[in-house]
Each structure stands twice: as C-alpha cells, then as structure tokens.
Amino acid sequence: DRSPSRGLGDVYKRQAGDSASYYEENGEFHFDVGTINIIVLTNVSLEPGTLANGLVTATEAKTVALNNLRIPSQFSNGFATGTGTDGIAIFSNMESKNRLSNAGKHSKLGELIAKCVIESISEAIKRQVWITKESQCSDLARLRRYDLDINEFYSNIGDDKEEFIKSLQEAARKQENVAVTTSILHLIDEVENDLLDKKVAYNLAASILENNCKDYCIQKLLEFWINKFLS
C-alpha cells in the first residue's frame, strides 16, 4: 500500500521475524535493491512523440548508471538494467515558446536528460544502498553476481579459515586483483553468452590467474570460480 496517508513510520513498521532489509558481513552492508522512480522536468514545449523519445533516453541512462557501478542482477549472473517496479515520468512546459522536436541521444536535450538521470541515480544509489565506485572496487563485490555457495568454497579450502578470510578481505581491495577478477569474469560472461568457446576461455583464465595474481587467497577463490564455470 503506497497510500499518501501512510506516514514514514508506518512504512517501516515490521514484525519480528520478517525478512531482513539488509545483512552485514565483515563491516560491509548488503541491501536488496528497491524501485527506481525517475521524474524528468523540462522548461520547453515537447510534442507527445518527443516526450516518448525522452522516456527512451532516460530509460537508457538509468541502465548506464547501473552498469557504471556494475550492479548485479538479483535473478541472473548478468548486470542489472533496472528493477521490476521502476517508474518514470517526463514533463514539458506547454506554455513555452521554445518547442523542441527531439530528445534522443543526438540532441542536446537528450544529452542533458541522460546526464541528469545518470547523476541523480548514482547519487540516490549511494545514499540509499551505499553502493559507490569505491565500494565496487573489490573482488568480492564483483563476484557477488554469480550464484555460488561461498560456504562450499570455504569448506574445501583446507586452510585456517579465520586467517584465510582475513587475508581475503585485505587482498580483495587491491586494484591489481580486481583487474584480474574482472578479466576472468568477462571470459565467463563471454562463455555464458555463447561468444567464446569454454576451453579457450578456461585456458586464458588460468593463464591470467597464474601470471598476474600473487595473493594466495585470491588465487584459490578465482580457481574455484574458474572450475565452476569454465571446466
């Protein structure tokens, strides 16, 4: 119920035992992504077709904002392009003498719409779910979009789990490790989209890992991912 009569406190009332809104792991907070509502206000006169054109531009810009942060889909191994309940509205000033005929990507209006949407969504995501470019610069953040049971990995590492996880948390933030992880995940994506042969991708991923990753914990983690998706 999204009735205006309901106050903020009513919206957040819940019963003990209800599904959590977030979980915390080692100082990192993970939230379920909510609805993205976009309102675009212009001070020019736009015909219905131009308004529709602007809607398309704004929708594409929303996807750009999500992809820039590498936000994962909650239902597949791909990147999110939005949520299932997103809304968008665009308004024009019908009294304006400045009438524009295009709001697509080639037009200045389209450029401004897209830039505003990207900036506002990026800021909203930062404030609402604390996802930023800095928080996404992590091996663990990049790997999160793949539906694997991390407990299965931990149960088979054969090392001191506490020390291993401590080392992993530190090594996962190194940019060189994030670069290696991103390269290997790109190969996995290529295979999942039938753009690359699995054997070729496996050999390349193994070579990238062997020649570019020096942290034992990251090596073990990525070996697990490679074997799960490319072997």
Residue ranges and their predicted role:
Residues 1-12:
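Single conserved hydrophobic/aromatic residue that forms the stacking wall/gate
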Residues 13-19, 23-25, 30, 42, ...:
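Polyanion-binding surfaces on beta-sheet-dominated domains and ring/shell assemblies
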Residues 33-41:
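Glycine-rich, often proline-containing surface loops adjacent to acidic residues and nearby aromatics
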Residues 115-170:
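Charged, amphipathic alpha-helical linkers/stalks
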Residues 150, 161-165, 180-181, 201, ...:
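Short amphipathic alpha-helical segments that mediate assembly, nucleic-acid/protein binding
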Residues 164, 170-185, 192-196:
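C-terminal non-catalytic alpha-helical accessory regions
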Residues 189-231:
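C-terminal non-catalytic accessory extensions
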